[in-house]
Regions:
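Mixed-charge interfacial surface used for oligomerization/domain docking
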Residues: 1-139
Length: 139
């Protein structure tokens, strides 16, 4: 029961570096992936009501997009349990992990920042450079 309660409070989202792997797995069309990669669009996806949905789209280099992603994710929120946050990555680009840690520290919300690697199944769909943030909301 306690685990189910926690699962309902967990918020998970991530930013993809490229859409090639999503297209190869059939999660988006090849044309969409090609256009997004040409324009430098980095989508932010989240699990909402048990479904994977695009939340926002960012343009630019991944470290800059990650900074915007953190701002959009955390700015003005007071419903976050600040005991810990997980940063999950799949072969992150140079500078991305530092950018995400700096962004999290800027908001001063989290006591523990824990780095994890994305597993092979999710990494196979998302591809290298994917960065995700996982935290729990307050009860």
């Amino acid at each position: 029961m306690r685990l189910q309660s926690l699962a309902n409070r967990v918020e998970l989202s991530f930013v993809l570096n490229q859409l090639n792997y999503m297209a190869k797995s059939g999660r988006c069309s090849g044309v969409l992936a090609f256009g997004a990669n040409i324009l430098g669009i980095k989508p932010s996806l989240a699990i909402i009501d048990g479904e994977l949905k695009v939340v926002r789209k960012y343009r630019g280099s991944l470290p800059i997009c990650v900074g915007k992603y953190i701002t959009d994710l955390l700015d003005g929120r007071d419903d976050i349990d600040n005991s810990m946050v997980f940063i999950s990555s799949c072969q992150p680009k140079p500078g991305c992990m530092e950018a995400i840690k700096a962004g999290l520290r800027k908001y001063g919300k989290f006591e523990n920042i824990i780095e994890t690697n994305i597993g092979t199944t999710i990494g196979g769909y998302s591809g290298p450079g994917t960065i995700g943030i996982v935290f729990a909301k307050k009860v």
